[in-house]
From Swiss-Prot:
Function description: Fodrin, which seems to be involved in secretion, interacts with calmodulin in a calcium-dependent manner and is thus candidate for the calcium-dependent movement of the cytoskeleton at the membrane.
Annotated compartments: Cytoplasm, Cytoskeleton; Cytoplasm, Cell cortex
Gene that this polypeptide is encoded by: SPTAN1
Major location (coarse): cytoplasm
Family membership noted in the UniProt record: Belongs to the spectrin family.
Organism, scientific name: Capra hircus (Goat)
Mapped Spectrin repeat ranges: 1-5, 7-14, 15-20, 21-26, 27-35, 39-46
Assembly and binders: Associates with the gamma-tubulin complex in brain, but not in kidney, liver, sperm, or uterus. Like erythrocyte spectrin, the spectrin-like proteins are capable of forming dimers which can further associate to tetramers. Interacts with isoform 1 of ACP1. Interacts with CALM and EMD. Interacts (via C-terminal spectrin repeats) with TRPC4. Identified in a complex with ACTN4, CASK, IQGAP1, MAGI2, NPHS1 and SPTBN1. Interacts with CLN3; this interaction regulates the fodrin localization at the plasma membrane.
Keywords: Actin capping, Actin-binding, Calcium, Calmodulin-binding, Cytoplasm, Cytoskeleton, Repeat
Swiss-Prot/TrEMBL GO biological process terms: actin filament capping
GO molecular function, one term: calmodulin binding
Record-level GO cellular component terms: cell cortex; cytoskeleton
Name listed for the protein in its UniProt record: Spectrin alpha chain, non-erythrocytic 1
Transport is among the record's keywords: no
Length: 46
């Protein structure tokens, strides 16, 4: 039972890590997108 438990824990942590990595990636893309938008606004403002 203990081996199975630790295996499930590993699976759980792995999915959690993958999930947060995915979130971080999405956040980074979001930030990149806004930087581009900001650049556009700045070029138009000049």
């Amino acid at each position: 039972a203990q081996l199975a438990d630790s295996f499930h824990l590993q699976q759980f942590f792995r999915s959690q890590l993958l999930g947060s990595a995915h979130e971080v990636q999405r956040l980074a893309q979001f930030v990149e997108h806004w930087k581009k938008v900001e650049d556009l606004f700045l070029t138009f403002a000049k």
